[in-house]
A protein has these predicted regions:
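Conserved AdoMet/S-adenosylmethionine-binding subsite of the radical SAM
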Residues: 1-86
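Long C-terminal interaction/binding lobes of large macromolecular proteins
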Residues: 138-139
């Protein structure tokens, strides 16, 4: 029934690596019922480690290949809506620093803000593994 609703792409979020099992289950269930196009938001600079962002992006790229679907991921930088940083863009998450955030933003500028299909493109932009991703962040 969900696949009959004229929503293209289906919008879904993957904000925490701890939800990987539920996220992949929901995605696979959607594909099973005929949905092939997804728009995916990935929160970063919140409570997670930078490497968690890499894992969530990698999971989406791998799922595109495995399921033969399109998942366009849009990493979104977290900004508090309350407290001292609610009116500026200077918030830095506990496990992040300004250099990491700028590196992610620079890569996203080159990819026009999204990550789509294609393992080779992803690996050139974000690295083939955690170590290469972290090297990109500290460059």
């Amino acid at each position: 029934m969900l696949a009959q609703v004229p929503i293209r792409p289906l919008r879904i979020a993957f904000d925490d690596i701890k939800t990987e099992e539920a996220y992949t289950k929901a995605l696979k269930m959607s594909v099973k019922h005929g949905i092939k196009d997804f728009s995916n938001y990935l929160l970063y600079n919140f409570k997670e480690q930078p490497i968690d962002l890499y894992h969530r992006m990698r999971i989406n790229v791998d799922l595109c290949e495995e399921l033969n679907v399109s998942i366009y991921s849009f990493p979104m930088k977290y900004h508090p809506i309350r407290d001292e940083h609610s009116h500026d863009r200077d918030y830095i998450g506990k496990h992040w620093n300004r250099k990491y955030i700028r590196a992610v933003q620079a890569i996203l500028n080159a990819t026009k803000g999204k990550i789509g299909r294609g393992v080779s493109f992803f690996e050139k932009a974000f690295g083939r593994n955690e170590d290469e991703f972290m090297e990109l962040l500290i460059m």
